């Protein structure tokens, strides 16, 4: 998932992991579990 900021990752990661824990690293999202 491409992103410009961590905020861009919250909803896609919420769908993937069920949790909004996410960071934008090198313009792509990194999802973390709960």
From Swiss-Prot:
Instruction: Report whether Plastid shows up as a keyword of the record.
Output: no
Annotated Gene Ontology cellular component terms:
extracellular region
What InterPro entries does the annotation carry?
Scorpion_toxin-like_sf, Scorpion_toxinS_K_inh
The cross-references to SUPFAM superfamilies, in alphabetical order and at most eight, read: Scorpion toxin-like
Q: Where in the chain is the site Basic residue of the functional dyad?
A: 23
According to its UniProt record, in which tissues is this protein expressed? Expressed by the venom gland.
What the record says about family reads: Belongs to the short scorpion toxin superfamily. Potassium channel inhibitor family. Alpha-KTx 06 subfamily.
The UniProt site entry described as Aromatic residue of the functional dyad is assigned to: 32
Keywords of the record: Amidation, Disulfide bond, Ion channel impairing toxin, Neurotoxin, Potassium channel impairing toxin, Secreted, Toxin, Voltage-gated potassium channel impairing toxin
Give the protein's recorded name.
Potassium channel toxin alpha-KTx 6.13
Question: What GO terms are given for molecular function?
Answer: ion channel inhibitor activity; potassium channel regulator activity; toxin activity
Residues found modified as Cysteine amide = 34
Further remarks about this protein from its record: Negative results: does not inhibit ERG1/Kv11.1/KCNH2 potassium channels. May not inhibit neuronal human alpha-7 nAChR, since it does not inhibit alpha-7 alpha-bungarotoxin binding (IC(50)>>20 uM).
């Amino acid at each position: 998932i491409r992103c410009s900021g961590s905020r861009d990752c919250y909803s896609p990661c919420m769908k993937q992991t069920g949790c909004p824990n996410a960071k934008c690293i090198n313009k792509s999202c990194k999802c973390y579990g709960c």
